C-alpha cells in the first residue's frame, strides 16, 4: 500500500513471451514473400480487350498453404494478449490446413498442440497434422468441434485459438505485409496494377475481411468477390441478408464453406458472391492443374471458376483490366480425393459438364 492506495500486481516475467515472438518473427524473416503468378490466358479472344489473371501462390509457405498466414497471426495475437505462456496447451477446431500450420508454430515454440476434428477426417490430413507435431482429438459430428475445443482447452488449462472468431481481428488489415498489401505491391509494375476484382473463398472469413478492409482503407477501386461451395451458409446468408442460417451438412470443398456463418465473415466488405457447384470446383482444379503442370487444391478450383466468370464478363463488356485470385494450397494433398475419379464418383459428382465448359471458355471466352 502506498499513500492509502491499494495495489494489485499480476506482472510476470515476459522473457519467454519475448523469445516466442522473436522466434515467430525470425521465422517470417527467413521466408520470402509468396509469388504472384501470371496465368496464361488465350490471346485469341482478347483482340479488343486486354485482360490479365494472376494467382497469388500461397503453396510456397513452409506449411504449404494460405493458412500459414492465419496461424502466424493467431499465435502472435494470443501471445500479445497474454493468453499463451510456456506451459500452455494450444487447441484449435480444425481438420485442415489451419491445424497443419498451427501445429508448426506450436512446435516452433515448444508447446503441445491439439486439433479437434470430426472422426471422418481423412488419414492423409491427420498424418500431415501429426507430422508437424500436433495431436488429433476426434468428435463424431462436425458441429461438435467448437464446444469440444473449448472443453479440451479448459480441461488442459490451455488456450483455444478459435480461428473462426479471431481470424478477422488477429491480422493487421491496414498493412504490415498482409496478403492484401502484398498483392498490391507485387502488382505495381503490371499493365493493370489495380485489379478490377480480387476473388477469394471463405472458410473463417478472415481473408476476405482483411482484403476487403484493405481495399477500402487504401481507397482502391478494386471490388471483392467471394466464391462459396455447396452446403455453405455464407452465400445464402449474404444473398438473403440473414446470418442465422445453419446448413444440415458440411462443405465438401476442403478449406472453404461453413455450415454456419462464422463471426469473422464480414459481408459489408464483399461486393459480390458466387455460388460454385462442387463439380465445377473439382473440374476447375483439374483444369488449372493441367495448365500449370502441377496440382492445385479444390478451393483454388472454386476461386478460378469465379475468376473465369469475371474475366468473361469483362471481355463481354469490353472492359480491360486484371483479376487476382489465390492458389490456396497444393493438390498433392488431395490425390486420394478430388483427383481420384472413384472418390469423386462416390460423392455423386460429375465434373464432365463443367470441364467441357472450361474448354469452351478457353476457346471462345464464352461463359455459361
Curated annotation (Swiss-Prot):
Its EC number is 4.4.1.1. SUPFAM superfamilies: Tryptophan synthase beta subunit-like PLP-dependent enzymes (SSF53686). Disruption phenotype: Significantly reduced production of H(2)S in all media tested, cells grow significantly less well in the presence of 4 mM cysteine, no change in survival in mouse macrophages. 40% reduction in basal oxygen consumption (respiration rate), increased levels of amino acids, glycolytic and TCA cycle metabolites, decreased levels of the redox couple ergothioneine and mycothiol. Increased ATP levels in the presence of 100 uM exogenous Cys. Increased cell survival after clofazimine or rifampicin treatment. Pyridoxal 5'-phosphate binds at residues 203-207, 299. InterPro entries: Cds1, Cys_Synth/Cystath_Beta-Synth, TrpB-like_PALP, TrpB-like_PALP_sf. Keywords: Cytoplasm, Lyase, Pyridoxal phosphate. One of its GO terms (molecular function) is lyase activity. GO terms for biological process: cell redox homeostasis; cysteine biosynthetic process; hydrogen sulfide biosynthetic process; L-cysteine catabolic process to pyruvate; positive regulation of cellular respiration; regulation of sulfur metabolic process. It catalyses: L-cysteine + H2O = hydrogen sulfide + pyruvate + NH4(+) + H(+). Its cofactor is pyridoxal 5'-phosphate. The modification N6-(pyridoxal phosphate)lysine is found at residue 67. It holds the Pfam family PALP. A cysteine desulfhydrase that generates hydrogen sulfide, H(2)S. The H(2)S produced by this enzyme stimulates respiration in M.tuberculosis, mediated primarily via cytochrome bd with a lesser contribution from cytochrome bc1/aa3. H(2)S modulates the balance between respiration and glycolysis, and also contributes to redox homeostasis. Probably eliminates toxic levels of Cys (which can induce oxidative stress). There is a large variation in the ability of different strains to produce H(2)S; H37Rv, CDC 1551 and 2 clinical strains were the highest producers of H(2)S. This is L-cysteine desulfhydrase Cds1.
